[in-house]
Swiss-Prot record:
Full protein name: D-amino-acid oxidase
Amino-acid positions noted as binding anthranilate 2 in the UniProt annotation, renumbered to this chain: 260
Biotechnology: Capable of converting cephalosporin C (CPC) into 7-beta-(5-carboxy-5-oxopentanamido)-cephalosporinic acid, an initial material of different beta-lactam antibiotics.
Cofactor: FAD
Disulfide linkage: 230-285
């Protein structure tokens, strides 16, 4: 059986999911090469900082919406059948204020919070809240069951799924994407490189995608459990400030957020912003603390900052010949990397097959 030597560059959720799906074909011999691996916490490495959850933000017929739809069955299956993966179901409410429509966060959440969304036919227990169930200042709200992911458990679990299929992991840093072809564990040059370097594709030689930009997210992790996952279309504190909370599976704590600050590279938590985040979360979900308590009722584990890899034209999944090396890109997933992970990885695998077939045809033609 002919083998395909493939290097996946990057070990975030996109790289690991793509490597796992590729490894299900025994003809693919895969090396994951990355500067950062699960267990690391670095501002360059976005995936560990994510909440993470499944709150669809793509329009129904958009690429993002289709990838979100394709990802849900996988996350549902893992939550149901693989508790060791760190994904669990959560009762979820998303609130909408009409006045947020023009804001940065209002635009980001527009599909999520609108009445009768496409995902209402996909996620279990969906219903729109009646007018008498709405808190003051809320124009409409959707309630449903979704999932929350403990990234500190899930990312290593993905590594384990890859390892069971023979994927080799190695730490490496490359100045140019074509150099990654020399990192295959066989010692031979890889037939193809899959670029899943996220925001680092902005400076990676051979790629240098200047349409990538950071959308800074700041969070507070607490021991309190509000009893549900909750979000709202905007805040009164700032155009790029967000309010959401989710409790991670397997004792991962509750994430309180947040921000969506484009072009902001600051890796240090802002203490004043942290106070605003905590106050907003308690206001949105009073069950977060004991009756009558404010932020003093929160038991803080840590503060965190991550940089979402936003791309102006959305995720890039396509093949390209760079310095004689076939490269398939899968990066630029913004704030929806986990909830599009399987959809995007499936598309990337299809593009890998196309590139390998094209490569084979060129070799066959050269022999004639």
């Amino acid at each position: 059986m002919a083998t395909n030597n493939i290097v996946v560059l990057g070990a975030g959720v996109s790289g690991l999911t793509t490597a796992w799906l590729l490894s299900k074909d025994p003809s693919n011999k895969i090396t994951v090469a990355a500067k950062h691996m699960p267990g690391d916490y670095d501002i360059e490495y976005c995936s560990p900082w994510a909440g993470a959850n499944y709150l669809p933000v793509g329009a129904e017929n958009s690429r993002v919406g289709q990838w979100e739809r394709a990802t849900w069955p996988h996350l549902r299956d893992i939550a149901q059948n693989h508790p060791e993966a760190g994904i669990h179901f959560q009762d979820t409410v998303v609130y909408n204020r009409t006045k947020d429509q023009g804001s940065t966060t209002g635009q980001w959440f527009s599909e999520l919070v609108k009445p009768n969304p496409w995902y209402g036919k996909v996620l279990p227990n969906f219903r729109e809240l009646s007018k008498d169930e709405l808190p003051p200042g809320i124009d409409n709200a959707n309630r449903f069951t979704s999932v929350c992911i403990n990234t500190a458990v899930y990312l290593p679990w993905l590594v384990g799924q890859c390892r069971k299929n023979g994927v080799v992991f190695k730490r490496a840093v490359f100045k140019h994407v074509a150099e990654a072809a020399n990192a295959h564990h066989s010692g031979q040059k890889a037939d193809l490189v899959v670029n899943c370097t996220g925001l680092s594709s902005r400076k990676l030689g051979g790629v240098q995608d200047n349409t990538l930009l950071p959308a800074r997210g700041q969070i507070v992790v607490v021991r309190n459990d509000p009893g549900l996952m909750c979000s709202i279309s905007g805040t009164d504190d700032g155009d790029d400030e967000v309010t959401y909370m989710m409790t991670r599976a397997a004792g991962g704590g509750t994430i309180l957020g947040g921000t969506y600050q484009k072009h902001n590279w600051d890796s240090l938590p802002d203490p004043n912003l942290a106070v605003r985040i905590m106050k907003r979360c308690i206001e949105l979900c009073p069950s977060l603390v004991a009756p009558g308590q404010g932020i003093e009722g929160l038991d803080i584990i840590r503060h965190g900052v991550g940089l979402r890899p936003v791309r102006e034209d959305g995720p890039r999944i396509e093949k390209e010949l760079i310095d004689g090396v076939w490269v398939v890109h899968n990066y630029g997933h913004g704030g929806y990397g986990y909830q599009t992970s399987f959809g995007c990885a499936t598309t990337a695998v299809e593009v890998v097959r196309e590139a390998l077939q094209q490569q084979k045809q060129r070799r066959d033609k050269a022999r004639l």
